[in-house]
Every structure is written in structure tokens, then in C-alpha cells.
Swiss-Prot record:
Annotated signal sequence range: 1-20
Function (record text): Major thyroid hormone transport protein in serum.
Main location as per UniProt: secreted
Signal keyword on record: yes
Pfam families the UniProt entry points to: Serpin
Protein name (database record): Thyroxine-binding globulin
MF annotations from Gene Ontology: serine-type endopeptidase inhibitor activity
Record-listed thyroxine binding positions: 293, 398
InterPro entries: Serpin_CS, Serpin_dom, Serpin_fam, Serpin_sf, Serpin_sf_1, Serpin_sf_2
Keywords annotated in UniProt: Glycoprotein, Secreted, Signal
GO cellular component: extracellular space
Biological process according to GO: thyroid hormone transport
Length: 415
């Protein structure tokens, strides 16, 4: 039986998981405010991978809530590719959307290194931090360069773990995850295969306040939300009259609303017309995002947004296989860039995500006094955007143009 590598991608509350290792050379200082052509190129490739993965989820879990962190999954797989060689490595990066002829491996590695550095760059009023942990079996001998890279270049915590005691290993990993996620995720790993010799755990912590927080006194406790033609549920509905960037895409039959966080992040709510969700999902791409970015116009909106929490857990193994990552799971897997030990292969890739949308922002907390801007007298002249049926949600970081989180809310009452 081959020894297994277990990849855990953890996302919570707007929190998630990411892992990455380094390319040759030293990390250069990153300046998140400085334009970077490589980052923008990568953001387009990463966005297209995100939408391809999203469409896989719609097939596997039709009519269900979807929520995951694309940047987490991409960065974790790139990290894995650093330890992979030959066709194992090629399949991973090509599944992510990279063409090694156009974008050499070293450029991909440096690009993700700078991406992670930029995302971790301190920003006032925005908590965004990527962390990594590597649990290595006591008998595994990782290559010194690989170990040095993940420790020094990506500040990865490395633990020596006794995987011969499966119960104790699970407890060690789950305790670390629970501590790092401030108790949001408990008992993440329920099952480890007996031959597991390495576990990679990656997370993003994200917390931000709306630039225009909602007044809780205006939240309606029970409002109808349409799940399908015959089913509605009752949800709390937040309300405000405010200026937002928005548009109606006549080609895709959807309304797009941009809600800014107080610093360097934004949420895009995509509300298709009834019966048009599938056509909108099929059209989502990096080009679509660029088009919307050009066309969004700021104006007064009478806005109704549900207050909700959702979560999603995925076993990515079968999904990644269908998308093209096959050698990594096979007996022919080549992880000789990670260890000289033979026979290492990928066992599983687990991903968990949790989201809360409330009056203040992405997490429930004491709500400060709400400052109201001057509102127009003739409110009936302004568009009403009522998010009262299934919608897509994207959360992006501005400086890197990265999709931190992507999802679809079908039923906001299903936590």
C-alpha cells in the first residue's frame, strides 16, 4: 500500500485555508499597492479556474448552496506542485489553467509567492491572513530544500506527527485547526487512512466591515425568499437606501451589485432573473468580471439583502480527478521534489467553508452607531434591488484582483 498525503483546505467565516511553497530564490518584498502585471495575469487564470470548479460543484450538488475559496484551492495545489515532478506536476498546473509554454513553472511559483505575500500585506480595518501547517510523519524524510522553503518563505508551521497512532494524529491536527480558527471549526478531520504520512492544512482568516453598514433597526425579521417556483423560506432582510455600484446586464439577464468593505475588499452579488441562473453560471469567466468592472455605475439604490450564514464541505478528490489531476492520486505519482521516499501519492483533498453576512459585515459583532448619509427625497425614482431569490456571491481582494470566496445561495436558511 502506498503512503498517503492528505491535503486539507479549510475556509471559515470568511475564513479559509491555503498552502503554498516557494520557488527558487528568496522572497522579494511585496508592495500590495504596486501594480503587478504577473499578479493581474494570474488573477484572470485563477478566476477562470474558480468558475470551472464552481460549475463542477453545480453538477455534483444541483440546487444546493455552494461556497468555497478559489484562491485557497489554487494556492494549495500550486504548493503541492512544488513537490511534484514530471507529469504529476504538469497535470496539477494545467488543471489550474496554466500553460507551461506561455507561463513557465518558475513564473507560476514566483507569482503565487507574491500573491500570498500581497494578500498578507497589512491593511487597516481589514483582517486577511493566510496560514499554513504541515504535519509530517516521523518516518518521512522530506527534502531539506522543500522543508526550508515552506518554513522560511511561507512561514509554515511544521509538526512531527506519529501517524501510526491515527486517533492521536487526528486529535493533534484537529486541535491545531480549532485553535487557529478560534473555535470555528471543530473535528475537521474525521478519518485518516492508516498509511497517511503527511497532512497539509491551510487556512485564510478574513474579516471585514461594510463600508456602509446596515442599521439593524431596519432589518425585517421575516421576509420571503424564493427557493424555486413553488417554495419560499423566511429570512431576516436587511434594508438601506445608499449609493452603490450596480448594473443590469441585459445580455446575461442579471443584476450585479457591488458592496464595498471598508478597506480593499468587495462583494459582488449577482442576481439572475427568474429561470436564468444556469445561463449566468455558464457565462461566468474572468472576461465577464472585467466587463462588469467597466460597466458598473454608482447611484442610489433601495437595497434589500438577506442576513444569513451558510457552510459547505467538499471532498475534492473525485472533482480534481475529473478536472485532470490524475497522476497525483495514482501509484505512478511523482513527488520526488518533496521526498526521496518512493510511492507517495495524494489521498484526499478536503475543503470546508463557512460564511456569515450581517449588518456590520462578515461576522456578527456589536454594531456601532450607523452614520447615515444624506438620502434623496424622491426614493421612488431610484432602482430597487431586492435579493429575494437564488444569487451568486463573489468576495474579492482589490490589490490582487483575487476571488477570495465564490458561492451560490439557493437557500439562506440552510446553515
Amino acid at each position: 500500500m502506498s503512503p498517503f498525503l492528505y491535503l486539507v483546505l479549510l475556509v471559515l467565516g470568511l475564513h479559509a485555508t491555503i498552502h503554498c511553497a516557494s520557488p527558487e530564490g528568496k522572497v522579494t518584498a511585496c508592495h500590495s499597492s504596486q501594480p503587478n502585471a504577473t499578479l493581474y495575469k494570474m488573477s484572470s487564470i485563477n478566476a477562470d479556474f474558480a468558475f470551472n470548479l464552481y460549475r463542477r460543484f453545480t453538477v455534483e450538488t444541483p440546487d444546493k448552496n455552494i461556497f468555497f475559496s478559489p484562491v485557497s484551492i489554487s494556492a494549495a495545489l500550486v504548493m503541492l506542485s512544488f513537490g511534484a515532478c514530471c507529469s504529476t506536476q504538469t497535470e496539477i498546473v494545467e488543471t489550474l489553467g496554466f500553460n507551461l509554454t506561455d507561463t513557465p513553472m518558475v513564473e507560476i511559483q514566483h507569482g503565487f509567492q507574491h500573491l500570498i505575500c500581497s494578500l498578507n500585506f497589512p491593511k487597516k480595518e481589514l483582517e486577511l491572513q493566510i496560514g499554513n501547517a504541515l504535519f509530517i510523519g516521523k518516518h518521512l524524510k522530506p527534502l531539506a530544500k522543500f522543508l526550508n522553503d515552506v518554513k522560511t518563505l511561507y512561514e509554515t508551521e511544521v509538526f512531527s506527527t506519529d501517524f501510526s497512532n491515527i486517533s492521536a494524529a487526528k486529535q493533534e491536527i484537529n486541535s491545531h485547526v480549532e485553535m487557529q480558527t478560534k473555535g470555528k471549526v471543530v473535528g475537521l478531520i474525521q478519518d485518516l487512512k492508516p498509511n497517511t504520512i503527511m497532512v497539509l492544512v491551510n487556512y485564510i482568516h478574513f474579516k471585514a466591515q461594510w463600508a456602509n453598514p446596515f442599521d439593524p433597526s431596519k432589518t425585517e425579521d421575516s421576509s420571503s425568499f424564493l427557493i424555486d417556483k413553488t417554495t419560499t423560506v423566511q429570512v431576516p432582510m436587511m434594508h438601506q437606501m445608499e449609493q452603490y455600484y450596480h448594473l443590469v446586464d441585459m445580455e446575461l439577464n442579471c443584476t450585479v451589485l457591488q458592496m464595498d468593505y471598508s478597506k480593499n475588499a468587495l462583494a459582488l452579488f449577482v442576481l439572475p432573473k427568474e429561470g436564468q441562473m444556469e445561463s449566468v453560471e455558464a457565462a461566468m469567466s474572468s472576461k465577464t468580471l472585467k466587463k462588469w468592472n467597466r460597466l458598473l455605475q454608482k447611484g442610489w439604490v433601495d437595497l434589500f439583502v438577506p442576513k444569513f450564514s451558510i457552510s459547505a464541505t467538499y471532498d475534492l478528490g473525485a472533482t480534481l480527478l475529473k478536472m485532470g489531476i490524475q497522476h497525483a492520486y495514482s501509484e505512478n505519482a511523482d513527488f520526488s521534489g518533496l521526498t526521496e521516499d518512493n510511492g507517495l501519492k495524494l489521498s484526499n483533498a478536503a475543503h470546508k467553508a463557512v460564511l456569515h453576512i450581517g449588518e456590520k459585515g462578515t461576522e456578527a459583532a456589536a454594531v456601532p452607531e450607523v452614520e447615515l448619509s444624506d438620502q434623496p427625497e424622491n426614493t421612488f425614482l431610484h432602482p430597487i434591488i431586492q435579493i429575494d431569490r437564488s444569487f451568486m456571491l463573489l468576495i474579492l481582494e482589490r490589490s490582487t484582483r483575487s476571488i477570495l470566496f465564490l458561492g451560490k445561495v439557493v437557500d439562506p436558511t440552510e446553515a
